[in-house]
Amino acid sequence: MPWIQIKLNATNDNAEAIGDMLMEETGAVSVTFLDAKDTPVFEPLPGETRLWGDTDVVALYEADMDTSLILQQIKASNMLAEGFAHKVEQVEDKDWEREWMDNFHPMQFGRRLWICPSWREVPDPQAVNVMLDPGLAFGTGTHPTTALCLEWLDNLDLSGKTVIDFGCGSGILAIAAIKLGAAKVIGIDIDPQALLASKDNAARNGVEDQIEVYLPKDQPEGLVADVVVANILAGPLRELSPIIKGLLKPGGQLAMSGILDTQAESVAEFYRDDLELDPIAEKSEWCRISGRKLG
């Protein structure tokens, strides 16, 4: 059965309210929020917005719905400006799960590391393979920020070292660190769902005994590590810089991403006095800041 899709443009201030209105008043069977500028959402700090500044609200309707009536209802809600931009499309019914699965393939990062969907055969059984189900967690390796961190980890000698994954999300970086030789990894995240995802993915990869996960309030006192990786956002990286630097042993190595190239210098300023920084690495408008703690 075909479906009708209506896409509206909104701001982060009214997108969720518009989504509620579409579900409750116009008969939408589902509503999805997409970034109009193709930027991913990262876990925000408490009080920060969860949506983008320029958000597309996409509503799905059964094919026999009257789109002109739906658009009148949207207009009558006064939640969008007069003459609001919209797009109406017919969407063919598909095996969405199969199509979704077909979009994910094993990906190589650095020399040794592969991230593989669990339903696919690993390309190189002798490589370091992390099995992950895209969609069951927050990070899958497809975004440049995750790729930058994975490539950095692959380039380190992690043998016997302790690693902290600050903002662990799916646990992809934590699991990769263990598979690359780390003795122990501690994952920290403000979202309990992220901790569950990390545990599930660690178990899927057989490394659950080497990974511990904590909410910030529960992390061990005096926690320090040889290596810290933080793939979050520029704002938290600046605001939490004393905490992040405090997690590093003297001589320890730090990598940070989730940073747009235009934000790199403003983040680096918070770390330059305490770390010997490497050249900034860039990928598709995103960047990685890394360095070694002085002392």
UniProtKB/Swiss-Prot annotation:
GO cellular component terms, semicolon-separated: cytosol
Reactions catalysed according to its record: L-lysyl-[protein] + 3 S-adenosyl-L-methionine = N(6),N(6),N(6)-trimethyl-L-lysyl-[protein] + 3 S-adenosyl-L-homocysteine + 3 H(+)
EC class (word): transferase
Protein name: Ribosomal protein L11 methyltransferase
Source species of the chain: Vibrio cholerae serotype O1 (strain ATCC 39315 / El Tor Inaba N16961)
Gene3D superfamilies: Vaccinia Virus protein VP39
PANTHER family (alphabetical): ELECTRON TRANSFER FLAVOPROTEIN BETA SUBUNIT LYSINE METHYLTRANSFERASE
Family membership noted in the UniProt record: Belongs to the methyltransferase superfamily. PrmA family.
